[in-house]
Structures are given as C-alpha cells and as structure tokens.
C-alpha cells in the first residue's frame, strides 16, 4: 500500500487541494491519502477554529471520495499538547501503516525551509518526499539530484490566503471551492470582515 500524507492548515481547503489529491491518486499511484489538519503559528488566522478547519477538510475528503474511498481527514496534530512536527506526524502514520510506503507531499514554499525542519533526515527515512513545484520558473533552488526527493510540477494559482482575502472583501469564491465547503463557510460566517 502507498500512503500519501499532506499536512496543512486547510483554512480553507480549496480546489487546489482537491486537484492535488486527485493528482496524487492518479499520477503518483497513492492508495490512501491522509490530509492532516495542523496549526501553524506562523500563519495568520482569520476566524476558522480547529474544529471548523477539520470539518471543512472532512468535506473535502467527501468530495474526493466520490470516486472511491481514498482520502481521510486527520486531526491528530490538532490533538497534540506540544508543537507538532512533521516527523512526529510521520511516526504516527507509520504506526498506523507499518508496512506501507509513505510519501510526504509538500508544497514548494514549505520545501524551501525543509533543512530547518525538525529531523529532516528522519523524515526522508520515514517517507519519500514529493515536492509540488509551481513551475520551473518559480523553483529557484531545485537541486538536480537530492536523494529521496521528487519534484513534480503542479501549477495551481489558488491559495487559502487569497481565498480568505476575497471572502473578506465580499467577493464570490464559489468557483474556487467545492460547493459543500462554500456552503459551510457561508453558513458559519467564516472569513468575513
């Protein structure tokens, strides 16, 4: 079994996350994808609580799973009483899937700081690292050969930050989110001024 792990704040999850999940299933041959909802203290938060972000991520998984069960939302990182590090998440996932091949899916922006992450060597031992680059012109520090690191071009102009900003300005984002998440955001009154 091949298990992919994608961590993020998912504040909110959007069609870019949906596309990445489907890409992982179809082109990386991932059998199971875990979307781990985390809390990044470096990221500005608007108004979505941990439980709301987890609920929206579960809605995203429901959308992804319409074509077959593949994706699970995970709140393990939110439940930790200490700062959560990727290496700890991967240890947890390894305990759930002891014989699986693990792939950590990371965005290009996160990859740039990979060397400063807690235990990057152990991360590479626990999982293949797949970096989703926004395109060759954006990936300025891509090493030609890094053991265990795979670079995949994945151009997606969406970001949760951009969506929160548009919602706060009263703009529609319905074409940029799964409809269930759009309805949830409107029902909960998230990201407004």
Swiss-Prot record:
Nucleotide-binding found in the keyword field = yes
Which EC class is this protein assigned? transferase
Q: Which UniProt keywords apply?
A: ATP-binding, NAD, Nucleotide-binding, Nucleotidyltransferase, Pyridine nucleotide biosynthesis, Transferase
Q: Name one GO molecular function term.
A: ATP binding
The record's annotation in Gene3D superfamilies points to: HUPs
- UniProt cross-references to Pfam families, sorted A to Z: CTP_transf_like (PF01467)
Q: Key word Chloroplast present in the record? A: no
> Which InterPro entries does its entry note?
Cyt_trans-like (IPR004821), NadD/NMNAT (IPR005248), Rossmann-like_a/b/a_fold (IPR014729)
Q: What is its EC number?
A: 2.7.7.18
Pathway noted in the entry: Cofactor biosynthesis; NAD(+) biosynthesis; deamido-NAD(+) from nicotinate D-ribonucleotide: step 1/1
Q: Which GO terms describe its biological process?
A: NAD biosynthetic process
Catalytic activity annotation: nicotinate beta-D-ribonucleotide + ATP + H(+) = deamido-NAD(+) + diphosphate
What role does this protein play?
Catalyzes the reversible adenylation of nicotinate mononucleotide (NaMN) to nicotinic acid adenine dinucleotide (NaAD).
Q: Which family does it belong to?
A: Belongs to the NadD family.
NCBIfam families named in the record: cyt_tran_rel, nicotinate (nicotinamide) nucleotide adenylyltransferase
Protein name per Swiss-Prot or TrEMBL: Probable nicotinate-nucleotide adenylyltransferase
Q: Which organism is it from?
A: Chlorobium phaeovibrioides (strain DSM 265 / 1930) (Prosthecochloris vibrioformis (strain DSM 265))
């Amino acid at each position: 079994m091949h298990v992919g792990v994608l961590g993020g704040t998912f504040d909110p999850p959007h069609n870019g996350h949906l596309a990445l999940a489907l890409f992982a299933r179809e082109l990386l041959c991932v059998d199971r994808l875990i979307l781990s909802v985390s809390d990044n203290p470096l990221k500005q938060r608007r108004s979505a609580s941990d439980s709301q972000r987890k609920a929206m991520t579960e809605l995203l998984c429901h959308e992804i799973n319409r074509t077959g069960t593949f994706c699970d939302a995970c709140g393990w990182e939110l439940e930790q009483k200490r700062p959560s590090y990727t290496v700890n998440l991967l240890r947890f996932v390894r305990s759930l899937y002891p014989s699986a091949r693990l792939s950590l899916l990371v965005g290009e922006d996160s990859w740039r700081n990979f060397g400063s992450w807690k235990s990057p060597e152990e991360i590479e031992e626990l999982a293949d690292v797949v970096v989703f680059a926004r395109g060759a012109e954006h990936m300025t520090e891509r090493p030609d050969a890094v053991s265990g690191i795979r670079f995949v071009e994945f151009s997606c102009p969406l970001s949760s930050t951009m969506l929160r900003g548009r919602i706060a300005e009263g703009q529609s984002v319905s074409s940029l989110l799964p409809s269930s998440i759009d309805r949830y955001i409107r029902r909960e009154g998230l990201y407004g001024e």
